Amino acid sequence: MAAVASWEDEIKQDIRIIKGDMVYENLTQKIIGAAIEVHKHLGPGLMEKCYECAMVYELQQLGLDVKTQVPVHLMYKGMDLMGGTSEKDFLRLDMLVDDAVIVELKSVETVKDVHHKQLLTYMKLTDKKVGLLINFNESRLVDGIFRKVM
């Protein structure tokens, strides 16, 4: 009887980690591992919010600080373009982990260029160097994981 591989083994098998000095490598590996664990239990096809709640649980179990739906202010020449608008109109990060890595969650048929641009824009606006785009609507989650570094 073969043992079930842990999420750490799955990461090593399914995700090619670039050798060398990766920014927040250990943290992003933990986040990806948590996403794989969530996907194993929930599978594809649910609403994004379901995955967000499960991810918060998994990341907190790992001792990580997780903030969700973090408002992002859009500044233009010193003016806050979001100032005076209702809170629901704010740009929001799906997740910010350890105040270092932005995690944008999706549950879409196909990740499009606009999803990558959204993450890169959030990284620029918040001055965060690393972001993960994770699409849970994949049979193999690793096919829906994208790591961005600025």
Pin down the residues of each PLM region.
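Solvent-exposed, charged helical/coil patches
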Residues: 7-72, 147-150
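Residue-level preference for short coil/turn positions at secondary-structure junctions
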Residues: 27, 97-98, 127
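Intrinsic disorder/low-complexity segments
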Residues: 1-23, 77-87, 93
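Conserved beta3 VAIK motif of the Hanks protein kinase fold
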Residues: 103
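Short glycine-rich loop/turn motifs that provide flexible caps or phosphate-binding loops at active sites
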Residues: 42-44, 77, 130
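Active-site metal-binding core of divalent-cation-utilizing nuclease and nuclease-like domains
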Residues: 47-48, 52-100, 108-109, 139-150
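Nucleic-acid nuclease catalytic cores
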Residues: 106-150
